[in-house]
Amino acid sequence: MPDINAEELLEKAWDEFCNDYDKRVGEYSESVTSRAEAEAAHWILWNEHDLMVQLGRFFYAQLARNSLSKIEMHIDVKLKYSSFKGYKFRPRLKDLRKELGKVPEVDLIIAQEDSPERFLLCAEAKCYHYSGDRYQRTAKGDIEKDLKRLVTIRDLGIAERVVFILFDDYYWIQNEDIESVAENACKEHNITLLKHNSKVKLERWK
């Protein structure tokens, strides 16, 4: 099998997804009659799971375009020791649980089919339609937890590459500058950041 740069393929898929999202949301927003209605609308994406599903469409298109096969994409995976019998990194899953204090669930895994080697890529995502601050949780704190998870996965050799994905439809990033928090943290930990601050939904009410 040829060397697979899953990160590069995911970046290309991300660009295509973002362009498609803005185009479709632009069409949907034509029927909206007020800013309040636009702010409350959750078109296409409701949460991180939806984001991964939509991104997956474009990732598999990239694989087909590049004549690549035997690559798997998995969503919302718990990295439990009992689930990875035969994988070379399996012993490190106990270390991962110890480091993080619990069995982590990752938003996205890209792996070679039927391969016992480390994953090609793991990614965590945040999809914001509103403020992430509630009770004791903050958007900044959630991002930092995701990045710690990715750093630990990478440093333990469970995944070859790690990526953080940040999507916003012109509500949270625009108001609270969470984008810069993610940028600075990803730079510090040498993690690739894929981000999109979609302004299309509210563009008519600038």
Predicted regions and their residues:
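Non-catalytic C-terminal interaction segments of nucleic acid-processing enzymes
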Residues: N175-K206
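Nucleic-acid nuclease catalytic cores
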Residues: V151-S180
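Charged, often low-complexity linker/regulatory segments
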Residues: M1-F58
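Mg2+/Mn2+-dependent nuclease catalytic core
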Residues: Y130-R154
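Surface-exposed cleft-lining segments at the edges of enzyme active sites
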Residues: E37-I44, P91-K98, Y128-T138
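Active-site metal-binding core of divalent-cation-utilizing nuclease and nuclease-like domains
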Residues: S69-R118
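Active-site ExK catalytic segment of metal-dependent nucleases
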Residues: D107-A111, F119-S131, Y135
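A domain-level signal for the structural core that forms small-molecule/cofactor-binding pockets
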Residues: L121-A123, E160-D169, I191-L194
